[in-house]
């Protein structure tokens, strides 16, 4: 009986710990998004889609877990549930509010803008150089450019996980034929050029 009680207590403790850890991941994800918004909200190119791509690239290149589950969307790797959660948390904390405009959704600063920074420094100081590089590189880039890099990164990473040999042409084929029809609006040459740029600038996946 004592063993059963002990086991039960352990189960309860584990459940509580798991719940707390999950909540912490969601908060850390919102803190990261707040820093991205803080740095990019004045840029005319920054909105919902670019936020998603910056989160994806940061998660992958900084090797951090923010509880995202991406799927292949028209605009690249996308996690709609996570983005809705982030938008809700940003507004709850009064850091940023998403407003729909003629040019799409914009992140508008609220009265507590900047108060996330203590948390950001706590959670992400170890990856700050890589994070800074991502933000500085894509700060003024248009949404399509961010979409191209994020999409290639995801397709490239998937091929690496397959443990089979592949070429740059295979990466592009994965994007053009196994992703979304809208990807075909971008020329094969442009995809190949972007792969080379990613290698030269340190944005290639390394699994």
What are these model-predicted stretches?
Residues 1-24:
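Amphipathic alpha-helical coiled-coil/heptad-repeat segments
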């Amino acid at each position: 009986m004592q063993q059963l009680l002990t086991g039960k207590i352990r189960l309860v403790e584990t459940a509580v710990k798991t719940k707390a850890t999950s909540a912490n991941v969601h908060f850390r994800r919102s803190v990261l998004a707040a820093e991205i918004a803080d740095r990019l909200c004045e840029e005319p190119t920054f909105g919902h889609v670019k936020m998603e791509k910056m989160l994806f690239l940061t998660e992958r290149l900084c090797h951090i877990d923010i509880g995202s589950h991406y799927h292949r969307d028209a605009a690249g790797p996308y996690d709609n549930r996570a983005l809705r959660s982030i938008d809700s948390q940003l507004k709850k904390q009064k850091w940023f509010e998403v407003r729909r405009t003629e040019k799409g959704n914009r992140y508008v600063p609220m009265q507590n803008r900047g108060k996330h920074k203590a948390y950001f420094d706590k959670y992400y100081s170890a990856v700050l150089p890589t994070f800074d590089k991502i933000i500085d590189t894509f700060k003024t880039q248009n949404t399509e450019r961010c979409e191209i890099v994020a999409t290639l990164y995801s397709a490239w990473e998937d091929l690496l996980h397959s443990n089979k040999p592949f070429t740059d042409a295979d990466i592009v084929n994965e994007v053009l034929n196994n992703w979304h029809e809208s990807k075909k609006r971008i020329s094969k040459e442009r995809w190949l050029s972007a792969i080379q740029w990613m290698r030269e600038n340190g944005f290639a996946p390394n699994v």
